Amino acid sequence: MLLEHFGNHPSFMMLGLGNELDAEIDVVREWLDDFRNLDNRHLYCFGSNNNLGWKGPQDGEDFFVTCRVGGGDGYTTHVRTSFAYVDAEKGGILNNTRPATDKDYSGAIAHCPRPVVGHENCQFQIYPDYSQIEKYTGVLHPYNLEIFRDRLKENHLSSQAKTFHQATGHFSIECYKADMEYAFRTPGFGGFQLLDLQDYPGQGSALVGILDAFMDSKGIVAPETFYGFCAPLVPLALMKDHCWLNTQPLHIDVALSNYVEGDWNEPVRWSLVSDNGVWKRDGVLMASIPQGKVGKAGSIDLSLSGLKEAQRLTLTLTTGKYRNYYHLWVYPDETAESEGSVHVASFLNDDLRKRLESGASVLLIPDHDSIVAQSVGGMFTPDYWNYSMFKTISENAGKEVSPGTLSILTDPGHLLLKYFPTECHSDWQWWSITRNSRPMILNATRGEYRPLIQVVDNIERNHKLGLVFEFAVGKGKLLVCMIDLQAIAGTPEGNQFRTSLLRYMKSDAFHPTEQLAWKELDALFHTDINQRQIIGVKNESDYTVGGE
């Protein structure tokens, strides 16, 4: 028996009876009672994430491993920030609440009289690197990767495969960091577990690891960077937002999550620097954090009025050998940019055709309800675990299917983004923008055509998706924006994105080279897309329970 043969092993501290069981609680409790009678030195639980957490902690468990601490309103009982759409409204906290770094799970674990361990955090899909196919020289053959690669080729996107991999990989790391730090910020939290650090090529292909299936690095994060937010001691910045106006006072609390072997009494050095290096502030705080505690070291209060142009700032926190970073964006507090000579439209109609034929500059922001069949939903975080599996589960449960996208992809140096600092992939300033969008399916465009701002699709569909794209139509110039600019007008980043877009359209740089006839444009917006049948693998968990 396991307890008899391994009970004395120094690493044997905890035992659970399985993973995501739909267990008969009385039977499992009886088993644990027998185990304790045989060896009471260990900590026992009924299993990991049994009943998907809906039934909450049970008498007889020493600790509780779960994604949620029983049922509750919204996300009040969640101890993980990301879910499948079938399991939490809009995929959970990270996708559906405005990004901030000052929240934690204190409210959720208050419902539990024993330690809570977060279950299978950080399941963010990353687009695959198809060069790994060559590694499969044994009995396993990567038919799945070959199929996905062929689908990409069908839509003339093969040249972007490596870029897709890098962009989605770098964005997934930001989501890893946010998910983990939610746990580290929570006083009294029992910890969290990842499913693994590597891809899981089974169950429909869950490519969610920072390592590939061979345990090789994907090259998306340096070990020292990962260690900065997943270590025995983690410096934490507590901010109410990532996006600020230069008229707002910046307040940041600095905390430490201390799980080293002793108390931590060391200085915390901080620096806040703009990407161009012109604006810089720094300082030192003194930390005194008891072992096993999450405590504040002090705060940072600054004026941002010296930043007259849109800037990304990087905050670095260093104490001893531990270093962590944060990005925030500061935008000038200005009145909304005028449309000027740009004509704004919501539908394709005869008036719009005539304007384009006569040489007008047109901004088309399609009414989202009118293009559902030609687009996919707006989503911020990378799709959870595996699209085909949870698409099927959602449909069978009668619940919303995830939009299934992975990240934006753009050229940060393009003049469209001159006044909206960004990297090539999604980051926190894109949250409201992507959530209020419907990326257009552009498979019917010329094979080599690329949108100005693209969205990386999942491996099952591999659509060419456009968030912002442009065409020359007749004598006119057309820019199509699949983002509801009105919906994001009240946010610092939304107003700034609109400003950058309109300034581009009013400049000489706005000169589309991709010619499209009106008939082709009309077909793009009114032809239903032939969708590939996607059948997910069977999963035994019951996603029809719960209240979300």
PLM regions: where:
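Short alpha-beta junction capping motif
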Residues: 340-388, 475-477, 481, 501
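Catalytic beta-strand/loop cores that center a nucleophilic Ser/Cys/Thr
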Residues: 88-103, 371, 391-492, 509-547
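Low-complexity, Pro/Ser/Thr- and charge-rich linker/hinge segments at domain boundaries
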Residues: 326-348
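Substrate-binding/catalytic cleft of secreted carbohydrate-active enzymes
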Residues: 1-210
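Aromatic-rich peripheral "rim/lid" segments of glycoside hydrolase catalytic domains that contact
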Residues: 38, 195-259, 266-268, 529-532
